Structures are given as structure tokens and as C-alpha cells.
Amino acid sequence: MGAFRWLSIAAAASTALALTPEQLITAPRRSEAIPDPSGKVAVFSTSQYSFETHKRTSWWSLLDLKTGQTKVLTNDSSVSEIVWLSDDSILYVNSTNADIPGGVELWVTQASSFAKGYKAASLPASFSGLKAAKTKSGDIRFVAYGQSYPNGTAYNEELATAPLSSARIYDSIYVRHWDYWLSTTFNAVFSGTLKKGHGKNGYSLDGELKNLVSPVKNAESPYPPFGGASDYDLSPDGKWVAFKSKAPELPKANFTTSYIYLVPHDASETARPINGPDSPGTPKGIKGDSSSPVFSPNGDKLAYFQMRDETYESDRRVLYVYSLGSKKTIPSVAGDWDRSPDSVKWTPDGKTLIVGSEDLGRTRLFSLPANAKDDYKPKNFTDGGSVSAYYFLPDSSLLVTGSALWTNWNVYTAKPEKGVIKKIASANEIDPELKGLGPSDISEFYFQGNFTDIHAWVIYPENFDKSKKYPLIFFIHGGPQGNWADGWSTRWNPKAWADQGYVVVAPNPTGSTGFGQALTDAIQNNWGGAPYDDLVKCWEYVHENLDYVDTDHGVAAGASYGGFMINWIQGSPLGRKFKALVSHDGTFVADAKVSTEELWFMQREFNGTFWDARDNYRRWDPSAPERILQFATPMLVIHSDKDYRLPVAEGLSLFNVLQERGVPSRFLNFPDENHWVVNPENSLVWHQQALGWINKYSGVEKSNPNAVSLEDTVVPVVNYN
């Protein structure tokens, strides 16, 4: 690797520059850092969008874990995934296929001479989520996931026959989910083997891929829309595969129940659930969502999480460890811990587990014995920021990748007994777009809420001076079981909003996660109750205690449940405290909740079905006539056509009411976006309109000549008045 030039990615701290929407969107986005077996270097990918070329470029780099320097490994954007086979040997996915349109290829190469690799396999469809294990014979067993036909063959969209009719016919729900309409194809995990050749001959595909999921009727893995490689695992010896699937026997729109399945890599047996209703080891009364199966280093145990409730997606996750072949009840590990971890790894000796969990507005790492009793309290060994990935190094330390409110990429090493050991790289010291951002840009406070102390973040603007006053931005998060965390977001980034000339306050009210399950659960059938009280008390705390915040010219914004709360605030006394409101994809008409796709969510939140508990659905109705009569604050409504969680009719209904009531309002719509706005060009318009709207009514547009304006958007405005 010495033939490459290593580049330093450290830079001297400098005066912070305002983070503009353009900089937020075009700043390089890096993946997790994956170390090689020697622990000397780590590989990571980078992608970057340009508003000059209107294209995204991507490349792979190596990070020297000793010096923090990087070098480009390859500029080939078709390299989509990389897996280390040895200190220098790499297996990667080429997202194109020279022989099969719509297929992909597996290549083997060396990190020291990447361009000299060779094709080991041509796969007949699009696959991702590659995991691989070397066997004692030297063969490589691998798994990846793609789309499947009902008969188990891989689905290739480019080669599929286009139907003559666009009709869709359904006899059961789901009909649609998140942003897609369900069809007869589904996700499935496929297995394959790369056979090691003799002498100088390289690896080649041995036989055909095997579908490990399709033999189980109605199973699917990974489960869309957010499922991925964490939904399955390959044992270190390559013999077994574990995968998660929703319960095949239950209506998928009504239950969150899912099981962990175990199947031989060679598909010689049909996958069986280890925690299904008829499995001998299933813990009594545990019927909720299962997740994150991970094999132990010697492959004889499997760690995973499961929730208790079969209709509650935000129930507390509990860690379980299954012994392969055992018929005993699967034991929980630290089962009483009042946190909900969502990632797990075994230490190399198989005695300890490392888990990642939301905790007090962060995502931290904790360690615990693999056989810990239920009353054990896991120990945290990371602090600020939010961990997104972690890998063991040869010295038993962990290479951690994360982010914070002030950086979109942070790499460091840590150990359970020592905490953070060494900082290796951080984007705010690398990228000109994030130049000078740092921990001093944020603070936090607690205040007395409806029934307990509530946490809130404070994000300061560029060149903040506490002797001055800055208008308030009041951020309300979605979920509702979610939180504002010390982590980077390219969609709702409080620093980008603050740098228009505001102080952003982002509270974690009733319903928030990471502060104990009681706070999370307390929002059930209470959407406009305790959370609203918390927000009122937060506003009052800011008004009375933060002298540098101008609450007389404040604004509020929120998405999803946060959009609902903005709609609720519009008809409440708190709405008169703000100069402008921004509601993104929020529910407005109580009776429209039945049009969502994940019916378990609304039925659990409001304690019953739409017909049995109608009063509960209507209790917190922003569209109630008496509330509409209070609407007065200028409001931007954002809603997109492919949002099937909260259909676009919700936003249109709200806009219609605002217009007819004479409230200054604007409707922003994206026909090709879902619950989120992710296309870079659309994201720029989203930021220009949202920031331009609040700047207009807060007065920032006049006080800050560099502030974003509604006129910055090149899209024409339709106005027949």
C-alpha cells in the first residue's frame, strides 16, 4: 500500500462558518469505517452531490488508524460494498454486470493493487448486504439479499416482463407501505459459495444461489422499508444463517410480531423459527418484534433482541442469547435494564456483549456479560454523539463510527474499561462545508415537565454572543416515540436552521425514547395531552431563563408527529406565541388515521380500532371546528405524494382550511418524495422554503442579509389570487 500517497485529514480549528443548506446537502457523506483484520487500516466510502454538475460522485478510501491519514482506494462508483477477506484481500460487489442487465458481480482483489482484481461471480439480479465467511478449506461462503419471485428465483427488474395493464388487485392488507405498493415479489436472503481454485486459479461461484427465505410461506427478510443487512447474519464458520421475518401467519398490517429463523447455509433444511409460537425455547408472553441476530465467535450461540408487545413498535427491546440446538427457554440478558438497545456485537472471546442504545439524547455503547442476570446494569463507555457502527480491533478495542450535532462523521477507538482512547478523524476538521463546527455549538438543559423532568438541546448560531438576543426556533420531533439526539441529520439539521440567525431549542417531551420506557409509553392515547404540556413548559422555561433567546419573534417546526403537534399548536394558546409555523407531513383530520398502512400503530396508540375507539382517535383532533376557529399564525404546509404513512390528503386538507380561514399559508408538495425529502435538488427547495418562510415572519430576513429567502427558489409559485 506504500505506493499510494496518504493525505492528512486533520485541519486546524478556525472560526465557524455559517452552515448553509447548500453546504449541508453537498458536504461529503461517509460510511462506517470497517477495519482490516490487522487493525492497521479501515475502508470507508464517500459520496458527494454537486449543485454545479447536478450529479453525485462516490469513491472508496483507506483510513490509517495510527496516523488518521487517508488515501483513495478506488474512484469506481460501481463498487457498492466491500468485505475484508484478509489483511490485504478484498471481496466487493460491482453494482453493474457486463453479461446480465440488472445483475451484479462479485470481485476479488487486493487493497494494495485494487485495479488488478478479477471477477469471481456473475449474479443474476441486484443484490446487496454482502456478508462472507472463509471456511477451513479456503472457500468463501456468502449471503446477500435481493428481490424474489414466489417460486424462489431472483427477481431482476430490468429483465422482468412489463405487464400490459397497470391495474393492482388486493385481497389482503398491506396494499401499500411507506412509499411503495406491494406486489408478488419480496425481499429474500440468498446464499452462495465461492470455490477456491487450485494453484494460481482464483475463486469462482460454485453452483447457483439458494433462496433461504422463500421455502417459508409468506416470510420476508430483510423486512422493508428499513430492513437491511442487520436483519440477518452468517455464522463465522459459514455453516448457519439467521434471519428475521415478520410472523408469516399473522396479518402484517396489524401486528409487529416477528421471529428469528435459523437455516443451514446450503439450504439443506427449511428455515425454522427459534422463538416462534411453537418453538420449544420461546420465552413465555414474548410476542413482539425480533431484531439484530448476531452469532457468537464460535457460532454456537445467537444474540438477538425482542419486544414483548405484539402491536407496539416502540416497546422496550430485551436482549436474548440462544444456544444452537437447545430446547430450553431462551434466557434474557440484563432483562430489567430500562433502555432499548438496537445493535449488538460479541467480544472475540465470546464472553461479553457490546450493545448500542439510545441514552439521554445520545446513542452510546454499553458492555455486559453474555450471561448477565436480569438485574444487571450495563456500563456505558462512550459519551457524546451517536454511535452508528463499531468493530473490534486485534487489541480488543473497538473502532467506532458516529456523528454529533456538530459533525456528520466521527471515528475513534474505545474500550469498555477505558472509554474513548483515541480520536482518529472527524468531518468538522476535514470538510470546508463543516469547517469550525464543534461541541461548543450546543448545550442542553432539563426542566420540569408534565410529570417528570424533560430534556432539551440548545443549538447556537454562527458566532454566538450570549449578550445578544436571537429569535427562537422550537423544534418538535416525530415518532412520536423518537428523540432529538446528539447526531447529524441531513433532513432536519438544527445547526443549519440556527445559522440563519436563531437559537434552536429541541425538547424531548413525553413519548421520547432513551429516557426510560415510562416516558416513552406515557404518550399512548395522550398525543395532545402531556406532550403539549411539556412543550408549553419548555417554552416558558426558555422565556424565563435564556436571556439570549427572543421568544417574541419565535417560530416552530416539526415533522410527522411533530407535524401533528404543529397542527395542534396552531389551534392552541401556544400557537399565538409564534410568528410562523412549519408543518411537514403531519396528521390533521382525526378520522383520516384509518388511511395509514401500519394499522397496528394507530390501534395501539389510541387503544383500539377505528370503530371501537373512535372517541380516542378524535380526542386529539387538530381539525376540530373549535380549534380551526383559533387558527391565526402564518403556516407553511409540506406534504409529498408518496407518503403512504400519512397520505397527502392530510396536508391538502390543512392547507384548504388555512386558505379558507384567511391565514397566510403556503403548500409545498413533492410528487416523488415519501415521508422524507431525500433528493438533493428537492432538499434544497425544502430548505429554501422552510427557512425562507420562518425568516420572512420572524424578521431575520431583514436583520440578516445572508438569510435564505423564499425568492431563492427557482420553482414557480402558483397563485390565482
Swiss-Prot record:
Q: How is it modified after translation?
A: N-glycosylated.
Primary location: secreted
Q: Where are the transmembrane segments?
A: none
Q: What is its EC number?
A: 3.4.14.-
Q: Which InterPro entries match?
A: 6-blade_b-propeller_TolB-like, AB_hydrolase_fold, PD40, Peptidase_S9_cat
Q: Which residues form the signal peptide?
A: 1-18
Q: Where in the cell is it found?
A: Secreted
Spell out the GO cellular component terms annotated for this protein, sorted alphabetically and separated by semicolons: extracellular region
Biological role stated in the UniProt entry: May be involved in metabolism of dipeptides or may affect host defense mechanisms. Has a substrate specificity limited to the hydrolysis of X-Ala, His-Ser, and Ser-Tyr dipeptides at a neutral pH optimum.
Report the sequence similarity comment from the record: Belongs to the peptidase S9C family.
Put simply, this protein is called Dipeptidyl-peptidase 5
